[in-house]
Amino acid sequence: MNYVPELKKYYKDSVIKELVKEFEYKSIMQVPKLEKIVISVGVGEAVRNKKLLDSAVLELAQITGQKAVKTKAKKAIAGFKIRQGQEIGAKVTLRGNAMYEFLYKLIHLALPRVKDFRGINGDAFDGNGNYSFGITEQIIFSEIDYDKIERISGLNITIVTTASNDKESKALLLKFGMPFSN
């Protein structure tokens, strides 16, 4: 039998039924679900130090279990000494089982390790049911060895759902156990 992540099982067994009751959907196909999770890191100093970008790519791969892709500058910014097409960051897009595994790890293992953690901002939805937030230190993930990192950097995490509005999306993430502060 194929492996199914715990969070995916929980979604199919409990969350769908609860959301159908709460929002009175006529079909379970209307119930919002996770589409993908995008984890990105911007390395502005990569302009001067290429080692930092390689380090960020490696750390993203360790955190997610999937190879990271380097991202390039869309346009030149003279103030930051960035040219168009220059590699300045990295990202990973998770789908399927890897997405559910990462979300479980984020909610239950990584976020509780943040100092003075009181929940994440519950207002950072984009109006289309997607949620984005930042983490200031990558060392909250247990896969990162504190002694081997080049420098402490932050991560941007975007959770893309099929929800049509923010209310449905927030309800979905709350059912998964996302620790919102408001």
UniProtKB/Swiss-Prot annotation:
Protein name, UniProt field: Large ribosomal subunit protein uL5
The organism of origin for this protein:
Borreliella burgdorferi (strain ATCC 35210 / DSM 4680 / CIP 102532 / B31)
Q: Which GO terms describe its biological process?
A: translation
The cross-references to NCBIfam families, in alphabetical order and at most eight, read: PRK00010.1 (NF000585)
GO cellular component, alphabetical, reads:
ribonucleoprotein complex; ribosome
Q: Which domain of life is it from?
A: Bacteria
* Described function: This is one of the proteins that bind and probably mediate the attachment of the 5S RNA into the large ribosomal subunit, where it forms part of the central protuberance. In the 70S ribosome it contacts protein S13 of the 30S subunit (bridge B1b), connecting the 2 subunits; this bridge is implicated in subunit movement. Contacts the P site tRNA; the 5S rRNA and some of its associated proteins might help stabilize positioning of ribosome-bound tRNAs.
Q: Which InterPro entries match?
A: Ribosomal_uL5, Ribosomal_uL5_bac-type, Ribosomal_uL5_C, Ribosomal_uL5_CS, Ribosomal_uL5_dom_sf, Ribosomal_uL5_N
Q: Which GO terms describe its molecular function?
A: rRNA binding; structural constituent of ribosome; tRNA binding
- Any idea which UniProt keywords this protein has? Ribonucleoprotein, Ribosomal protein, RNA-binding, rRNA-binding, tRNA-binding
Q: How does it assemble?
A: Part of the 50S ribosomal subunit; part of the 5S rRNA/L5/L18/L25 subcomplex. Contacts the 5S rRNA and the P site tRNA. Forms a bridge to the 30S subunit in the 70S ribosome.
Q: Which family does it belong to?
A: Belongs to the universal ribosomal protein uL5 family.
